[in-house]
Amino acid sequence: MVEALLEIHDMQDTDPDADRLGVMVRNSTGGFTALSGNQVGALITDFLFRKRKASGRFSPQDYVVETLVTTPLTREIAVHHGARCFYELLVGFKYIAQTMEEQGTEHFVFGTEESIGFLAGSYCRDKDASVAALYVL
């Protein structure tokens, strides 16, 4: 069992209704460090844009959405990839969902809040830790 634990590179956990995702990664001392919602959101944002570009599905109309308490790094990643970012929204995923409705879902890539809430896809209008966890793997 100890050997198996030593090989773990990251740990993930959700709250009971699986709408928030916590992530810990192995650090240089062999322990684990918790990532903030901002860090996880930035990593997923970059990953999704890279995958879209690699598969030929990227469009400059693609966009991510973040609320005003979320790091500006998400916006910088979107700009770096040549995409759009809607930011400075009021706190709450209902405002991310509202932006999806206003902008259309065809080019929606990702919604994120610093409170470890993520949505990767347009299949729903609320946080989904299950799909976000797959992207962290």
Model-derived regions: residue spans:
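Phosphate-binding chemistry for phosphorylated carbohydrates and sugar-nucleotides
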Residues: M1-L137
